[in-house]
Amino acid sequence: MAEQMGQVASLFGDWPEAIIWTCLEGRMGQIHVDNTQSPQSALALYGRQSFFGFLAGKPNADLLKMCEGKDIILVPQNQAWSDLIEGTYGDRIRSFTRYATKKDTSFDLGHLQKLIDALPEEFDLKVIDRNLYDACLVEEWSRDLVGNYADVEQFLDLGLGYVILHKEQVVSGASSYASYLGGIEIEVDTRG
């Protein structure tokens, strides 16, 4: 099994995506392949309501079909995958560039503390606990702050997040969107 997962991981190469790492570790999400004995194509599928699908290796129409009917962002590894997606879905898709933030960085804790200290009195910064986990699930805009975790227990075990409250209502948050051994993918949302 470890050898096969190594083969699958090699299909993704050094693609710097936390969501892929999360799926490969088996913590969250799923990995699908064209052939379990000798995989040539792989799909890292992540999400619970809306999804990301990272497509790697040789383009494979069957893996692409697994994504049908989902609210999904497909992320092709190369032009060959892009061509298959465009050939399969034509004008039913919208292509766009997805930008990532810098992954290997450090926080200026002093600057963060100044921002917290400058928060107006009527706002409170709180760590996401059981009650705030549930509060984040109530409204669509805040669901991604916790919604990719199977339940509150998984979030408290693997995740991390903070929200800003105004009059006891969640108005903004920063939280783990995905968790892997080396870190988290961060989701930031603010009520519109």
Residue ranges and their predicted role:
Residues 1-30:
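Amide-forming acyltransferase catalytic core, primarily the GNAT-like/NAT-type
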Residues 7-11, 22-23, 66, 84, ...:
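Residues that form generic nucleotide/phosphate-binding pockets
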Residues 136-139, 187-188:
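A short secondary-structure junction signal
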